[in-house]
Amino acid sequence: MYTFKIGIPAEVHDTFVKNHPLCNLLQSSSWAKVKDNWGSEIVGVYEKDTLVASSLVLIKPLPAGFTMLYTPRGPVMDYTNERLVSYFMAELKKFGKKKRALFIKMDPAVHYQDFHLGEEHQPHAEATAIVETLKKAGAKYQGLTMDMGATIQPRFQANIYREDFSEEQLSKSTKKMIKTAEKKGVVV
């Protein structure tokens, strides 16, 4: 039995997000402070006394008293649990109606593909299944658009993993900027 809750305490939400495989900075409660021109609320789903899904929801005022809701890189939950996804989405829609939202945007931190430059890449089968689960729950999938205006966050993310990184790879100007920052007290 699931229970949807509005007003999850920030520390409870942050602990849940930090310990979840889909952890993302944009789902931290602190992100709401960065987006201080939007309202915010933390919502979640409990199964008995255990938080099983949570999301920072940003609320942007629109003309005529309407809003739009946005869950940056969220909601954070087990997307392989169709019952949970369906319940969360239904409750999020009800929450949106209370907030007079015209629409809800979301872009969960589900990796569609992961690859190193030059490697062949295929979509993750689980990501494709997650898209189908979300569609069954009523989400409208925007597809793999290349139009930057169609999404709020960039679709592509380039990473340099710690195990693949060495300072020798950096350009001379980057090394100089790092040294300058360190002299000014920035920890790099």
Predicted features by range, described:
Residues 2, 14, 45:
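Residues lining hydrophobic/aromatic ligand-binding pockets adjacent to catalytic sites
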Residues 28-29, 87-92, 141-144:
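Short alpha-helical segments and helix-capping/turn motifs at coil-helix boundaries
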Residues 8-16:
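A short, well-structured alpha-helix characteristic of acyl/acetyltransferase catalytic modules
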Residues 33-122:
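Conserved donor-binding loop and adjoining core beta-sheet/short helix segment
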Residues 21-38:
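Short, basic/aromatic recognition patches
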